[in-house]
Amino acid sequence: AGSRVESIPADHFNHCVAVVKLSSGTYMPLDPTWVPFCRELWSSAEQQQNYLPGVPEGSDLCLTPVSAPENHYVRIKANNKLDAKGTLTGQFTITAEGQSDSNIRGMFTRGWQSQWKNMLESQLLNVSPKARLLSVDYGKDPKDYQAAPIKITFRYEIPEYAIPGKEELVFKPMVMNNLYNQVKSYLRINTDLPERQYGFKDGCSRLVELDETIQLPKGYTLLNEAKNESKQSDAADFKGSLSQDGDKITLHQKLALKKRVYEAADWDGFRSAVNAHKSFGDYKK
């Protein structure tokens, strides 16, 4: 296998994998390098790359298929409460599958158990250095990657999360404030560029769903107008909303990134969806 393999020279291959013949007669690649601690038998971090099966009937070069974004979902659901002093209290649950699961679960499968709590706390400290982890529930055995998709629930308190002003509080939604950015590989792609002449790569196709409810102190209202936005293209889709009902603000986002390897022509659709997603990051009460 290799990210790009020419038709003849064998020295373009960088490692060997295996294939299994399915009942349909098609061949499915298996990669023993990445199967341990991964919930798929072929690493989708290597989708859209060349491989050459060594089969009795012979084969030409093949291309590993695109993996649907929903195979690699990451979902964060937060329920928070903000007081007039700017202290945020609440809980969030993160769930993930596929390559997103492997990214989040890695601290359990590759890290020291004595450091689990510190590493989980660091996710909150990325949001605010004043964050306090009250409790965390990662199930009975988070190393058992074959049992189910990863699920972790945090309870926390963050003093001075919101910046108080004259009869106002300014803050960013927690689910968009450096929370588990490690799995959001698309954030490492500069979407300020208006156009690209060449193709580009992300870590993996991915589905990102972010939901947050924030209960405001009595008398506070959202200054920004309610927001609904959607984008669709062959490269990426986005749908998001922000609204207030009573004393609660509700944020919802769904970002589907459909490939790992993109052509230059995909840039406008990818960039538009990711920038729309980012635009929900700031608002003021």
What role is predicted for each listed range?
Residues 1-285:
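A sensor for short, sequence-defined functional sites
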